[in-house]
Amino acid sequence: MRVKHKPWAKDRLEEFPAIYIKNPEDFKGQWHEVFGNDNPIHIEIGSGKGQFISGMAKANPEINYIGIEMIESVLVSALDKAIEVDVPNLRLVARDAKLLEDCFEKGEIAQIYLNFSDPWPKKRHTKRRLTNPTFLTIYERLLPKAGEIHFKTDNRSLFEYSLVAFSEYNMLLTFVSLDLHNSDYEGNIKTEYEEKFSAKGFPIYRLEAKFDRN
């Protein structure tokens, strides 16, 4: 989907330094100082317009959340959501997922959310998928031993690819649903895409996984 360029987005984001972290590399290993506490940090990679990450931050004040979205013209919508919920445990960052190790120390992130990531269906684009082993290597470094990845998508092909990728990486699959909204899973917070696709009757696929470091 083509994103409409908003030339004013960068300036708008920088008007709210309490929410938008312009230079996240400056806080590598020091994110507890940003939040003013030692609560666990959860990140969403590809936050889109921010409905999920804002909802999570509001529902779980004992956890710190960082929404990461590389496109500033999209992240500015997440900023509006963050302003609306007005909670102290939410920050936003504009960075490519490939650069996360520049922003976070090893083991600094307790949990990672991947919601409705671009499926990159063409074979030559496989390495761009956020569940590709290249990215799993990055996530493994960011997460502590007990850290988890939570992944949701409406794309069955991407979900099947991800199941294989996680398994071949020797990850432990602790939860798998092929129809999340008709399962007994509680506490689900929907993304904008999730609402749209589920309203059309499409099943939502979800998994939870962690790295096997025994």
Swiss-Prot record:
The residues the record assigns to binding substrate are 122, 154, 191-194
Hey, which pathway is this one from? tRNA modification; N(7)-methylguanine-tRNA biosynthesis
Task: Pull one GO CC term from this UniProt entry.
Answer: tRNA methyltransferase complex
Q: Which reaction does it catalyse?
A: guanosine(46) in tRNA + S-adenosyl-L-methionine = N(7)-methylguanosine(46) in tRNA + S-adenosyl-L-homocysteine
Group of enzyme by EC: transferase
| Protein family (similarity comment) | Belongs to the class I-like SAM-binding methyltransferase superfamily. TrmB family.
User: What does this protein do, in the record's words?
Assistant: Catalyzes the formation of N(7)-methylguanine at position 46 (m7G46) in tRNA.
* Record-given protein name: tRNA (guanine-N(7)-)-methyltransferase
